UniProtKB/Swiss-Prot annotation:
Protein name in UniProt: Large ribosomal subunit protein uL14
Protein family membership: Belongs to the universal ribosomal protein uL14 family.
InterPro entries from the UniProt entry: Ribosomal_uL14, Ribosomal_uL14_bac-type, Ribosomal_uL14_CS, Ribosomal_uL14_sf
Gene that specifies this protein: rplN
Keyword vocabulary terms for this entry: Ribonucleoprotein, Ribosomal protein, RNA-binding, rRNA-binding
Organism, scientific name: Yersinia pestis
Keyword rRNA-binding included in the entry's annotation: yes
GO MF, one example: structural constituent of ribosome
Keyword Acetylation: no
Cellular component GO terms, alphabetical: cytosolic large ribosomal subunit
Gene3D superfamilies to which the protein is assigned, alphabetical: Ribosomal protein L14 (2.40.150.20)
Self-association state and partner proteins as the record states: Part of the 50S ribosomal subunit. Forms a cluster with proteins L3 and L19. In the 70S ribosome, L14 and L19 interact and together make contacts with the 16S rRNA in bridges B5 and B8.
GO biological process, one term: translation
Amino acid sequence: MIQEQTMLNVADNSGARRVMCIKVLGGSHRRYAGIGDIIKITIKEAIPRGKVKKGDVLKAVVVRTKKGVRRPDGSVIRFDGNACVILNNNSEQPIGTRIFGPVTRELRNEKFMKIISLAPEVL
């Protein structure tokens, strides 16, 4: 469950290391975002010569949460931290060309096939 002011790790090579959620998109008073949801983020920590810089405001899709996601068979997939993949504000395609760490199959339902194909492992 990601809400405003939540700090997340970045699971791609866009150049950002830590980001902060500033808005959960999809509804006027929506409070929480889970895996596969799009959020508005600001870059809090970035590496030199990256594609993004500190202070940039972009969109991102949540790919891993500590809360996890429940499957229809009753199993729950949880992760050690919250992570997102940074998206282009207009096309909503990933800015990075590599994805680090596993992602869940739930992204397939949300039409993020590019992230699924770049990920090293899909749970």
